Amino acid sequence: MKKLFTLAMLLVVAIAANAQTKKVSILGDSYSTFKGYIPENYAPFYPDGNNDVKEVEQMWWSLYIQAKGYQLEKNDSWGGTTICGTGYMGMDSSRSSFIARVDSLGSPDIIFVFGGTNDAWAQSPIGEYQYADWTKEDCKSYRPALACLLDTLQKRYPKAELYAILNSELREEINESTREVCKHYNVQLIELHDIEKQNGHPSISGMKSISDQ
């Protein structure tokens, strides 16, 4: 009888522990890609010959998940993508933009949005602050696109904790715009600093810094 009781208690504990395991999804760009862990048609950066990150366990999100005891739900990260619908050389990137991928995150408890880097590097239009009634044309600029993205994520995943991550060494126009839009939607913004990079992307040391920050 005691053995049965003990087994039952262990089962209850195991079920409770499993129920408490949070699921994490990432909506990102090349900084969060790793071959085999993103959709097959997406362009990965990692692993790369010019960067010392070679194993998925060295990625910032993997380090975070391991440290917290969480599990990966979805990693919808695509190298070279912008939050807005204007990519490099002014090309229309609406189909690969962060906004176009909001429905691909599964059923997460936590969502990390790690973008804006390519918007900065591609010199995408900054636009005006706009918090409703977005058109496709509006979302070709950074400020309205980020607002549309956060608004859509909050409505699509109302129970999820939403965090935005802002890369270091971006132009101040992007930084300030991101702060303002995140403040409007009460989204916690993680502003990175002192991130070691190789070939423009976080190294092993940089990945650890991202995870820790």
For each feature predicted by the language model, list its residue ranges.
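Sec-dependent signal peptide recognition
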Residues: 2-7
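Alpha-helical cap/lid subdomain in secreted, periplasmic
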Residues: 93-213
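Short hydrophobic segments within beta-strands
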Residues: 27-28, 165
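Active-site environment of divalent metal-dependent phosphoester hydrolases
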Residues: 33-34, 171
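Hydrophobic h-region of N-terminal signal peptides that target proteins for export
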Residues: 10-18
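Short active-site segment of divalent metal-dependent hydrolases/proteases
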Residues: 31-32, 206
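Conserved SGNH/GDSL esterase-like catalytic core that processes O-acyl groups on lipids
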Residues: 23-25, 34-127
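N-terminal hydrophobic or amphipathic helices/low-complexity stretches enriched
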Residues: 21, 30-31
